[in-house]
Amino acid sequence: NGINLRTDPVEAKKYIGFLPQRPPLYPELSVDEYLTYCARLRLMDAREIRQAVDTAEAKCGITHFKKRLIGNLSGGYQQRVGIAQAIVHNPRFVVLDEPTNGLDPVQIVEVRHLIKEIAAERAVMLSTHILSEVQATCDKIKMIEHGHMIFSGTMEEFNNYVEPCSFLVTFGNP
């Protein structure tokens, strides 16, 4: 966008959404209260907050939990609330750090689907150490090792890149 994060961080952060590995949730707040609080932290216009919260809740499939306390939600729904706070201000770029960490298999599939929906509308960067997460969610991959990019390409190119490093382990019957 041409905005320098170092010289104009407040303006630049308007275009960035972030979900840390452990979402910064307040269990004593309702989903609505929390997302409204996050929108205010993002310096959103007060007249736009209600609509922005409703839109984020709908996108993340948590509309029916808007009045529930976050502490009473399952891990999967808490993660959805975390994702909602990352998109409530409608950023152009969203960073998700280990978004399926600690979720059960059904919740993982649901959150992956949600990530793909969000990625259809804006740029999403997924930070993860789980290869299956990358394969199930990403179109383009950049691999960083010790602060240096060691791979950049498509999923197909990535599969060819890691194939020589892979091996298959099989177990026979005892």
Regions found by a protein language model. Name each.
Residues 1-145, 150-151:
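ABC transporter nucleotide-binding domains
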Residues 156-160:
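Short acidic-hydrophobic catalytic motif
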Residues 165-174:
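Short, charged/small-residue-rich alpha-helical element at the C-terminal edge
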